[in-house]
Design a protein with these regions (language model features):
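Alpha-helical transmembrane segments and membrane-interface helix-loop junctions
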Residues: 1-164
Length: 164
């Protein structure tokens, strides 16, 4: 359910970014006029697409991984490896949340040149994605530990991809 909501949000942002770029090109080449706000808006949209997309890929298990050694481990050690991986992911989420939040506060009083919106809106994508990553990793640690104690694979995601 969460994946589908994220996919819809990201798709909407992508459609908006493509629409803004298309309109900017039409204005530039067909009407010989530039839209001064198109770059700033496209940049904001692409920032959110990037960070929300990274979180969605994490939820689906779609990030690049090398499993040559882990696949050869016995199930309990694979589970420990999974839990350790989630600890590292949680640490990354915390770093993004903490330092991204500091960046938001640092640039809150600065505005963009054309749209005159706070640049904090650009940076807010980092702590938002970091918080989501942190919560997801904590949830997967809990579920993974329970599954491991029950004698199952720790990773609850089917084939490490798809809906949770």
């Amino acid at each position: 359910m969460i994946n589908r909501i994220l996919e819809a949000i990201i798709a909407g942002l992508l459609v908006a970014a493509v629409g803004v770029a298309f309109v900017a090109v039409i204005y530039r080449y067909a009407l010989d006029s530039a839209l001064s706000w198109s770059f700033e808006l496209s940049l904001a949209l692409l920032t959110y697409i990037t960070f929300l997309g990274a979180y969605l890929a994490l939820r689906k298990g779609a990030h690049l991984k090398v499993t040559l050694l882990v696949d050869r481990l016995p199930r309990p050690l694979r589970g420990v490896s999974f839990l350790f991986n989630q600890v590292l992911i949680a640490m990354l989420g915390w770093i993004m949340l903490w330092h991204g939040g500091r960046q938001v506060m640092r640039f809150a009083d600065q505005t963009t040149t054309v749209l005159e919106i706070s640049t904090a809106w650009y940076y807010a994508a980092i702590p938002v994605a970091g918080g989501l990553i942190l919560l997801d990793a904590i949830w997967l640690m809990g579920v993974g530990a329970i599954r491991l104690l029950q004698g199952n694979e720790a990773d609850p995601r089917p084939n490490q991809s798809g809906e949770i």
